Amino acid sequence: MPKCAGPFSMIAAHFRKEKPGLYSDCEVIYVDDLRSLLYRLKDQRSLTKEEWTALIAGRTPELAEELFSLARQERHTWYGHDIYIRGLIEFTNYCKNDCFYCGIRRSNRNASRYRLSKEDILSCCRLGYELGFRTFVLQGGEDGYFTDIRMTDLIESIKKQYPDCALTLSIGEKSYESYQAYYNAGADRYLLRHETFDSKHYAKLHPPSLTAGNRQECLWNLKRIGYQVGTGFMVGSPFQTPELLAEDMLFIQKLQPQMVGIGPFIPHHDTPFAKEPAGTLELTLFLLGLLRLMLPKVLLPATTALGTIHPKGRELGILAGANVVMPNLSPAKVRGDYLLYDNKICTNEEAAECRALLEKQMAAIGYQVVTARGDSKMQTHVLTFEETTSVNISHHF
């Protein structure tokens, strides 16, 4: 097959490195069939499970480069060359859950635990606002200390001081009533990765107290309330297959979230999955491109995990179709303690340094960081109970 050409062949080179000798000349016809699936996805914004599986399992460097070109066209149509920044505040690494892949899981006695005070969090917001951030993301483990009363007080305080900013929460599974209380207090968006749609796969990644069904119900509740909703999954998690990824894409297709966050699985040394192989850059980039074709108006981050597994990971994510980056506004003294996975980047730089570095990185590939709320251009439709019941698909396709 011909060598990759074009300015983004650096991305395609990773396919050859990570999947050597997989393709032969006899597969050209099959690759042409996969190309037709790409264009069907672009035109119809949907595929069947079998088509998703074939596209993911049969990906090639040439197919990837064509995908990335299409994805960039879609992103430029709706968002131009603007890259939105979110100020990430990791305010607690206490968590009641014991997910098998997570470095802040309850059973990890080697984790150095911390909680930021309300004053600390507001200080992070103040610094972020001065640096031009207009979206703050409060992320943390499921920490019982932060009751609904404490959370609503915190949300109200942030929105009172920064009414022109969007506030995103990423604090896990809560009751409908809790989600409603946060929304009433002023929260705009909520990020909750579904991690994997398949219930059996979910059970291999989590203890019995956590289920795929409850996770998905939380997402439908968030949609029902009126949040701008974000979901997503790890790429290359243990036991993951192309068929399971196809189900993830079908679920996202049904959910129609305003944001999708995906990143490679990276093992943490103090978890049961410490010896498992990490997810790959090439598959993560390929899936980013597919997500952009399926949901052209979606907000799609180039995640910190991408930057962790490759020095140019975030830039490559942007070139694959992403349009969001999330610099860390947490105090430098605690960043090294919020380690969901090993070797996380940007744990030592000050917030201003992270912002300046990202601007340089984005400018080098022809994009510009903008200081705006950066709302999704997808419509936020408040689902009724009847609507969520009708679209809340079962655990089998």
Language-model segments: residues:
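Auxiliary Fe-S-binding modules of radical SAM enzymes
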Residues: 4-60, 129, 253-397
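Canonical Radical SAM [4Fe-4S] cluster-binding loop centered on the CxxxCxxC motif
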Residues: 79-120
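Active-site-proximal loop/turn and secondary-structure-junction residues that shape catalytic pockets
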Residues: 89-91, 142-144, 171-175, 196-198, ...
